Amino acid sequence: MIQKSRPALLQHQDVGDRVETLMLQPVIKAFLCGSISGTCSTLLFQPLDLLKTRLQTLQPSAHGSRRVGMLALLLNVVRTESPLGLWKGMSPSIVRCVPGVGIYFGTLYSLKQYFLRGHPPTALESIILGAGSRSVAGVCMSPITVIKTRYESGRYGYESVYAALRSICHSEGFRGLFSGLTATLLRDAPFSGIYLMFYSQTKNVVLHRTDQLDAVLVPVVNFSCGIFAGILASLVTQPADVIKTHMQLFPMKFRWIGQSVTLIFKDYGLRGFFQGSVPRALRRTLMAAMAWTVYEEMMAKMGLKS
């Protein structure tokens, strides 16, 4: 009996050793650090994402009527749906952001190790690395992004993530899960590239001019550089975000990017491409700044260079 059980025990130990070895891989550590940082930022800033989606999909106001602002919309959501209504769509957001941010940071770490081999990236290299990493994450998480957008809009009554997947596949086919993917990549890839470029270059300038920076101030510097980079990147990519939202919510009407641009301009004018810019800039800036700050701190604790 003892001799028969030993191979199974040894096999179990081998599997355990493989799992332990895998968890020690730097790329896996980068993925885990990114996932944890994504969880923190998503939980805190989900209300801003919901307000952004609602503002972008408001019906055009009649001539002379007062436009609905972010504060008025926030109060309306709290009044009609309760304060927890601000966290509507939390489940798909977590499902998307946690692995999505992990995939982004894991891919970024791998690309840095392969192409840069330890030297800091130039401005152009930062743009390429950030855009490439975000594109990989965007394609992987596109189905969840579609579901998240529809959850937050309040126009769909999905009972669960599985019910949403089944409904979309039944009514729109598998292709429906990738509605607005091109617009998403046109928004996210430039955002991540521009963000990483501003973030890394700004941080290099600050750290270069400061010979000895107190360790306590390092997260503050990282967060401040993240805020600056996020604001600039958000403004540049706002029109693509509006187009993406309309294509994901109304795929039968907004079928391709050129048509979407024409329809949005016809209904809302040039201002329509910047609807929801305030909550989006706040959310993207704060989320990215927090994600990078938490990520870099965790990577430093693990003895890895981010």
UniProtKB/Swiss-Prot annotation:
Listed InterPro entries: Hem25/SLC25A38, Mitochondrial_sb/sol_carrier, Mt_carrier_dom_sf
PANTHER family: MITOCHONDRIAL GLYCINE TRANSPORTER
Role noted for this protein: Mitochondrial glycine transporter that imports glycine into the mitochondrial matrix. Plays an important role in providing glycine for the first enzymatic step in heme biosynthesis, the condensation of glycine with succinyl-CoA to produce 5-aminolevulinate (ALA) in the mitochondrial matrix. Required during erythropoiesis. Plays a role as pro-apoptotic protein that induces caspase-dependent apoptosis.
Solcar repeats by residue range: 25-114, 121-205, 217-301
Pfam family, one: Mito_carr
This protein's encoding gene: SLC25A38
Keyword Membrane carried by entry: yes
Stated family: Belongs to the mitochondrial carrier (TC 2.A.29) family. SLC25A38 subfamily.
Protein name per its UniProtKB record: Mitochondrial glycine transporter
SUPFAM superfamilies: Mitochondrial carrier
Phylogenetic lineage: Eukaryota, Metazoa, Chordata, Craniata, Vertebrata
Record keywords: Membrane, Mitochondrion, Mitochondrion inner membrane, Repeat, Transmembrane, Transmembrane helix, Transport
Membrane topology classification: Multi-pass membrane protein
